[in-house]
Each structure stands twice: as structure tokens, then as C-alpha cells.
Amino acid sequence: GYEGYIPREASNVYEQKFGDCKDMSSIITCMAKYASIPNVHMCWIGTRDIPYSYKELPTPLVDNHMIACFEFNDSTIFLDATDSQTRFGLPSSFIQGKEALIDQGNEYKIKKVPVVAAQENQTKETIKIKLENNALYGNGILNMNGLIRTDAVYLIGDALERDRFEVIKTLVEQGNNKFQLNNYSEENIENKDLPYII
């Protein structure tokens, strides 16, 4: 029914300390009002799983998600509270290229979410190898940016020790089933504004 499209009051979300995408959008817009930040609106949006636009199918079937957006000057920043690992300013990967229906009180407008440029999602890898006793040995640095970084950090999740070692190994093994990882270190896993480095 339509309840899936209607956000709850921010005060209820705050009391419950829990909410879905609609609830998170509601609390973001309410917090912005309390902080005197203008032009923060709720937006209905379809994820990339839904192939329709509002022009093709002007019904609620176009939407299965809710976010907030912040409009200033001629820019719009799309705020998806369900994606905790993407850096501020980038849209989450599952809403890129989709149309957002932006609530403006008694009116609405439709705005397309930009697709993140390829250079924002670069992976840079440096590997130094040597041949010794008929085996290749080496070390390397894997530097992940943008949504590539987001995917890697989600893949790792909160894995600890042995599980984390295995997840890291899958990220760096180059598709070779004879690859052995001896050790690794990580940088910037907590800082979304910097590349994640293994």
C-alpha cells in the first residue's frame, strides 16, 4: 500500500532510534531545519533495479527508496542515509542516473542524480615482483577511491582476524588461485574522504 511511500515523523524515528530509508530521510530533513540549513528536502527515488522513469510511468511504481537532498546555488547533493560508507557529495551507487522526485511542500520537481565520473572511482595498484627459486614473490599497494572504495569497505564489513584476512586476500589476489598472502596493512578505512589503501 501507500504506507511504503510515507515517511514517519522524525520525532518517532528519534524515539525508536531505528528506521528505514523513509525514516532516515525524515530525520535528516528535520535536523536540517533545526540547524537552520535551508533547502534540504525529502526525495522519492527508484534504485537502479527499477527500469522506469517518471515520464514513462508516472506512478509510485517508479520509486522503491527515499533519500534527502540539499540544494544550494546551482548544485544538488543527494543524501542517502542507508549508505554509510560513501563519502559526502557522491550519490550512492544504486541511485546513480535515476530521477529523484523532490518534495517542495505543495509542489515537486524531478531532478536526475548524476552518474559518478570514472576518474572518481579509480583503483591504482603498484606491484613489485621478483623471481626467486622458480616462484614469484612481491609486494604491492592497492589504492581504491570513490564507489570502488565503498564496495571494498562493505565487503570487508566488520570481519575480524582470520575472516578479514580472507576478505583482504580476495581483494588483492589477482584471480590467481596459487596466490598466497603473507601479511597486509590497511590505511584510511575509517576516513571516507581518503582512498582506502591495502
Functional labels for PLM-detected ranges:
Residues G1-I198:
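A sensor for short, sequence-defined functional sites
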